[in-house]
Structure formats: C-alpha cells, structure tokens
Amino acid sequence: MPLTGPNDIQGVWATILCRLDDDNAPDLAAIDEQVAAYARAGCDGVYSGGTASEIHTQTDIQFREISARFAATARKHGLPFQIGAAHPLAHGTLGRVSFARTLDPGAIQVTLPDWTPLDLAGVVQFMDRVSEAADGTPLVLYNPPHAKTVLAPSDLVEIARALPTLVGIKCGGGDRGWYREMAPLLEQISVFIPGHHYATGRKLGAHGSYSNMACLSPAGAVTWARMSGREALELEGRIASFMADAISPMLNRGLPGFACDKAMAAAGRWTEISPRLMWPYIGATNTDVTQIRFAARRHLPEFLKAVHA
C-alpha cells in the first residue's frame, strides 16, 4: 500500500543489516530473522537499502536479491516497508528505482547523485526523472549530512512543491531555527531525523526516525519512542552519554557510521551478526563490540533487557 506522508511514515523504522557468509556475500536468511525481530519489537516500519544496509557496496544482482527477499518477508509480517534504491550515479539510481517499484513497496528511498554537487535546478530535474522511473510509487529523499549536496530547508520546500510524489525526507535534523524553517513542510511530508535525537526531534516537529538505536535494540528503541516528556528526554541524555563513550571514539578514528550501526547490532545480540563489512570497507573489531556492550550496560541497561523481554 502506498505511503502518503506523515500519517503513514512516523515512529521507529528499522533497517535490515547484511550478515555475511564465508564468501563475504550477504546471507539472505538474515533478512527473514531481522524482519521477524522488528515485527516482534513493534517497529512502525522497515526499510532496506540505506547506508547501514551497505547499499553502496552491493552489486546490482545483490541489490535485486536483497530487495526481493526483503519485500517478501516484510509483506509476510504485515509491516509497512520502503526499499532504498540509492546509487552514487544518476543513471544507476534510475535502474534501481525501476526495479524497486516492481516489488510494490510503500515508498522508495533515493539519494542525490554523489560525484559532484548539484544546484537546486539540477536536484529538481533529477528528482523529476526519478519520479518517472518510480511510476507513481511515493518517494523518500535520503539526504544525510555526508552527502555531496546537502539541502537547506528552503531547498526542500521548493523540491516538495515541484514533486507531488515526494512523501518524506531522511536528514540530519537541526536546531530550533532549522525546525522553524522546516515548518511549511512538516504537515506535508514526513521528516525523519537521527535515531539518537528521537525525543527532542519529535518534540520540535519531526515525525520519527530511521533508527540507529534500533540497531542496538529494536525493542529498546520502540519503548523509548513510546515514552513522553521528561522521561523520554532523560533517556535521550543517557543515549548521548552512550554515544560519547562508545561510538564517538570509533568515528574519531575514522570508522564510518554504518560500521558503528553494525557493531551496535552485534553488541545488542538481538540478531546473529558480526561487525564485518562488505568489501572494500573495514569494520569494527570484536573489541569495539565488547566496549559498545559495556557502555550500553552502563548507560542503557533497559535497551539490553528489552532484547530478552
């Protein structure tokens, strides 16, 4: 069923992660296990093809196999789902979007071309062609802080005005001023921010998160999302301490964020996975995983307890 915006795309959405077999290829059985775990945890939706899914390392054949398996198991569990069809090259995006729409997802996530930056006119032109390839399937624009073209709120307002099929955006969020600038969009499209900022983001007007905290514990992330007021903000403070203790040191030594996401899943032990990444990336170490679990026990014991509840 197509997703139409804030009413359909809100709360905690969780990503599939690539468990690797002995040949360093994605183990498709892990998709079934992870989606089942997300359904048990009460996640609001699931998605594939984000950075944490290592889409930038997948061959086109792997992308198709993963997307098809994911769509089938998400449908089996009755979870709303989106398929990420990101590609660093514009024509590559069109090919992946054309395939993704055949799987009838609620929406397709796309990124902007990433070799050189685009101006606003170029972004609109690109998104218009993507919309044609999607053939009526709603679109979610994934515009992370590390993208070559990071869009300002005023740009997003213009793009949404020009593209009726745009129903959501995944972005880095911002301060109160950023949310004020985003106000014209907040009733029109779903705005998702980083998972560890969930409580403050929701308070300021965001609709939810494609959650990195669900990598540590899907049930923990959902439980936090259902809290309100001071309780939710207090937990967010402890999440910030956890991130500073466990994740920032990994980022500071050059590990990418998606390596941290996978290491968090290994530490959370809600799914069987190692921190190893697909070629050519180097993942976190087993020592990193142990340190993440230790930090979670210290700062977020309820996240680890939720795994076994």
Model-based region annotation:
Residues D8-L17, A41-C43, G205-H207, S217-A309:
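C-terminal alpha-helical cap/extension of soluble enzyme domains
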Residues R129-D135, P144-G254:
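Catalytic alpha/beta core domains of metabolic enzymes, predominantly
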Residues D21-N24, T59, D155, K262, ...:
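Solvent-exposed, flexible loop/coil residues
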Residues P2-T149, E158:
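Active-site beta->alpha loop and helix N-cap motifs at the rims of alpha/beta catalytic domains
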Residues F63, S67, T93, M127, ...:
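A general structural signal for well-ordered alpha-helical segments in protein cores
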